[in-house]
Amino acid sequence: MKTFTQLREEVTPLNENAEKALAYATAAHKGQFRSDGSEYIRHPERVAAYVQKFKKSHNLGKLISAAFLHDTIEDTDTTHKDLEKMFGGLVAGLVKDLTSDKDEIAKIGKKEYLSRNMETMSSYALVVKLADRLDNVQDIATAKTPEWRRTYKKETLGILDRLGKNRKLTGTHTKIITAIKKKLDEVD
């Protein structure tokens, strides 16, 4: 899978906004690392690359920007107002939609929270969320314990099945869900 950095030349008219978002996200996530030890920014880069791969839209630059920024409110000192000022209402709104409410998760559990949230978020936000989930399942074969992998797989499939029953999905959503399920099929 190409990273957004490798896809830059394919996104020519969108570079300025996306480059600004990448620079902001890189600075915001500085010093953060994934469980595999890689720099955290590699995750938003891959999410942006998946959005680029699967989504065709006149707002693609804004979707890619939101993909880069999707964890900034949740995992850094960034606020919704910061993003709105720098990137506009659409990008800031998408990131806000993608930001988990930790108090709500504590009340109802992560699986239920994600299911409800994904059923009601905007179509654009769902594209980014599914791209995020696709990137997260890429690491599943080598992550944690076999029991954790089986639980994560079962929860993800449950969320996706519920999503398919309770929401009208676009072709883009369906393609990303298919890619997620294909990757999960590789997991024991």
Give a label for each model feature.
Residues 3, 7-188:
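Active-site helical microenvironments for divalent-metal-assisted chemistry
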